[in-house]
Amino acid sequence: MEPLDNTSLEESQFRPEKKEKSTCSICREDGDGYHFGAEACRACAAFFRRSVSLDKTYLCRGNNDCEITANIRCMCRSCRFAKCLEVGMNPAGVQQRRDTIGKREIKPDSTDLMQLLGSVGDGYPPTTSAQSALVEDLHPSFNDRMPILMKMRVNYRKMDNARLVIHRKDGQSLFKEKTPKAVNYKEACAQSIREVSLVADWVAWCFDDFVTLPMDQKKVLFRNFYTPFSVLEGAFLCHINDTSNALILPSGDYIDTNNLKSFFNIPDEEQPMTDDEIEKFCRMFKPSFELNRRGLVLPMMAEKIDVFEFFALCTFVFWDFGLDEQTDDCMMIGKSVKDRVMKELAFYLRCAKRLEEPSLRVASLLTLLPALQRCVRRFQEDIEITNVFNVYAPPKDFYDLVNGKFC
């Protein structure tokens, strides 16, 4: 046997190995390195860049599960773009086209209500337009895979802008910034009653399946939804505005939970109790506000719940089942809607939030629902107490509203 040549051994040890060619994670063609956060070929990288920069919206003619491989001559663009997102391509990495002309002033052609609401929203940010990543909009490229949640976001902004109009007092300018103030219980009741038609419209704008239901089933769902939604939304508004010592209302006003005496004080009216009795009354209701803070507001803050996760929770609350007078067809439709939203939520958590374990996040979200039920029951019990003893009792229409006895 011939001795091993040490020189040849050294050369073999330090000779660079032949690099394996990468594969495009979208179409399985030969890769061209990392583009926008994922291994991709030049064709898929160019397709993604063009789709994002031009705000393209694609529609799948199948079931959103088309095969995406390089040997298919005409790949489904909708599924191809969805695959780009699923493998980790980030739309934020695409440099948007520059406007070489510069910003141009756009003059309104008319002064209809929708344009008026839009301009109000620009002048005074609505409640969910706080400067927070929790309420940021997604790139339009996500529209195809999250149609319901994206529709809820667009229509929630419309509702938010409309709130700026309906909660204005007579004589107040629509274009002057409204300063939030602490309200008393009569003002809070009146604001909640004004909210009913807006929330009903929002539900109809968001869910096409709701519009097709018989009127009696619409009433069953909405009666069951309004009070839990009000409690859930109030907690979310506190969360995104980073406050836990007040209860923020959709109007932007708030209940000062550290000074409940002012909540039960009605200026220019004779008080039904002495100051000492009011103090005892406040101590009796303080635990209810604390339950809301500890059960909903603080957990939302800890989990950093964002606006799309909030919409998913709203969907689960609205399409409840086993309700009095609810039909089997209504329950089946509700299950179908919730299944679709759950798929959209899973896609959002995986592709937009980049979570490795979306199921754990979903589980954390769902733990808020039992706490919501406890807060709603406590609120209804408090309203019942004030009604029975006729002390700071709310008007009948608000009492019926809270207990689902309206419409």
From Swiss-Prot:
Residues 394-405 are annotated as: AF-2. Keywords: Activator, DNA-binding, Metal-binding, Nucleus, Receptor, Transcription, Transcription regulation, Zinc, Zinc-finger. Disulfide bonds: none annotated. Residues 130-405 form the NR LBD domain. The keyword NAD does not apply. Disruption phenotype: Abolishes R24-induced expression of irg-4, irg-5 and irg-6 immune response genes. Abolishes PCN- and P.aeruginosa-induced expression of irg-4 and cyp-35C1. RNAi-mediated knockdown reduces lifespan of animals fed P.aeruginosa, but not E.coli OP50. Suppresses the induction of hsp-4 and the accumulation of active xbp-1 following exposure to R24. Abolishes PCN-mediated protection from P.aeruginosa killing. RNAi-mediated knockdown abolishes PCN- and P.aeruginosa-induced expression of irg-4 and cyp-35C1. PROSITE patterns: NR_LBD (PS51843), NUCLEAR_REC_DBD_1 (PS00031), NUCLEAR_REC_DBD_2 (PS51030). It comes from Caenorhabditis elegans. Residues 21-96 bind DNA. GO terms for biological process: regulation of transcription by RNA polymerase II. Pfam families: Hormone_recep, zf-C4. Belongs to the nuclear hormone receptor family. A zinc finger (NR C4-type) spans 24-44, 60-79. Gene3D superfamilies: Erythroid Transcription Factor GATA-1, subunit A, Retinoid X Receptor. Ligand-binding domain exhibits affinity for phenazine 1-carboxamide (PCN) and xenobiotic immunostimulant R24. It is found in: Nucleus. Expressed in intestinal epithelial cells, excretory gland cells and in several head neurons. InterPro entries: HNF4-like_DBD, NHR-like_dom_sf, Nucl_hrmn_rcpt_lig-bd, Znf_hrmn_rcpt, Znf_NHR/GATA. GO terms for molecular function: DNA-binding transcription factor activity; RNA polymerase II cis-regulatory region sequence-specific DNA binding; zinc ion binding. GO terms for cellular component: nucleus. This is Nuclear hormone receptor family member nhr-86. It comes from the Eukaryota.
